[in-house]
Amino acid sequence: MGPGFQDAYHAFHTAQDERQLFRQIASVVRQLGFDYCCYGIRVPLPVSKPAVAIFDTYPAGWMEHYQASGFLEIDPTVRTGASSSDLIIWPVSIRDEAARLWSDARDFGLNIGVARSSWTAHGAFGLLTLARRADPLTAAELEQLSATTNWLANLAHALMSPFLMPKLVPESSAALTAREREVLCWTGEGKTAYEIGQILRISERTVNFHVNNVLLKLAATNKVQAVVKAIAIGLI
């Protein structure tokens, strides 16, 4: 019988930083009967190459090989998790586009695994993976994992995000005023400063004042980038 939500909840809240929290997550994963675990988070910025942070207890050398081989770009669990929050089960067959990934993983002792994704309001995508060397998954275990990994992945992501988002996306901590959000929203609709002033019944100069404040808060070089950043991290 694995750990319950309340036990994990209280244990996780004792963590002072992301590394302590991950150790607590790994402990719960071991209690669930898995040798290894991995938590990864991908944030929406920079748009051209979203920042990623990964924590794992995998066998030595696997993550270095994984990253050097570019497996992140073709990993089916990442692709599936990005569009579905269902339990992801590692394939028994390795005859797919990621055949080398699965083959190499097995060479490192990563034979059996499941994964579960979750999201936060700031657009951060999290993926929790549980893996082990042997013992195929049974129908009863999968039924249990379907429920357990749901709360575990969401709890882990919800508590990891406050530690990691300010480091990976400093803009996520920006506090925009109601007026700044209004100005940004209308800017996103393609309105000029003059038109926004007419809509909000404020001067064009005041509109530009709010725009400049937003640019500073979001570390943006222009209005377009400010709108993109604000939408990506859920500020508007």
Swiss-Prot record:
Q: Which GO terms describe its biological process?
A: quorum sensing; regulation of DNA-templated transcription
- Taking every annotated instance into account, which residue ranges of this chain make up the domain HTH luxR-type? 169-234
Molecular-function GO term, any one: DNA binding
Q: Which Gene3D superfamilies match?
A: Transcription factor LuxR-like, autoinducer-binding domain (3.30.450.80), Winged helix-like DNA-binding domain superfamily/Winged helix DNA-binding domain (1.10.10.10)
The DNA-binding region ranges are 193-212
UniProt-listed SMART domains: HTH_LUXR (SM00421)
Q: Which UniProt keywords apply?
A: Activator, Autoinducer synthesis, DNA-binding, Quorum sensing, Transcription, Transcription regulation
Q: Which Pfam families has this protein been placed in?
A: Autoind_bind, GerE
Cite the InterPro entries for this sequence: Sig_transdc_resp-reg_C-effctor, TF_LuxR_autoind-bd_dom, TF_LuxR_autoind-bd_dom_sf, Tscrpt_reg_LuxR_C, WH-like_DNA-bd_sf
Can you tell me which family this protein belongs to? Answer: Belongs to the autoinducer-regulated transcriptional regulatory protein family.
According to UniProt, the name of this protein is Transcriptional activator protein SolR
Organism, scientific name: Ralstonia nicotianae (strain ATCC BAA-1114 / GMI1000)
